[in-house]
């Protein structure tokens, strides 16, 4: 197993600087991570710096609350792709899910999938805020909307990926969708536990530490 190719090397902090973006880009090149995952404002620069490499550029949409309108998420997705994004991690409308407005949740995801125009879409369901029933429903709606992955967490809601949630999500989507575990994956043991539970992608700022078998104190 090539661990690096399962990692989205991530920097989504509010105060991310160009120097920090350069660091994760250089690390991604050196370790050959699957992607760098950065906020939309950094997509064009990251795309330019990674041109000619195998490292993809991933970005986040409706992040971290999922509470922007569907039209805004759609535009944000198109803009990100125009700037060079190759993978899209979107946040669902969490409030609508909790209200039982499932059509609204599905339509929101569908709009992003359509705007992504064939690019990989990962749907962040924010597991820490959901009941088990809501987690299952969020996965089902993501599948119905045409997404490619379901993803556990933004890392901004006070909790991250757990083995139990990854197993539940994997059991729900089977082999039809993939599962991305993110938030709190800090070391090789965490990484291995998530992969064993069914994740096929890991979102982490601790990518280097994971590969080196070291511990990180980062939250994402």
Curated annotation (Swiss-Prot):
Enzyme active site: 89, 151, 180
Biological pathway: Carbohydrate degradation; 2-deoxy-D-ribose 1-phosphate degradation; D-glyceraldehyde 3-phosphate and acetaldehyde from 2-deoxy-alpha-D-ribose 1-phosphate: step 2/2
GO MF annotations in UniProt: deoxyribose-phosphate aldolase activity
Uppermost EC category: lyase
GO biological process: 2-deoxyribose 1-phosphate catabolic process; carbohydrate catabolic process; deoxyribonucleotide catabolic process
SMART domains named among the record's database cross-references: DeoC
Family note: Belongs to the DeoC/FbaB aldolase family. DeoC type 1 subfamily.
Protein name, per record: Deoxyribose-phosphate aldolase
Lineage, highest ranks first: Bacteria, Bacillati, Bacillota, Bacilli, Bacillales
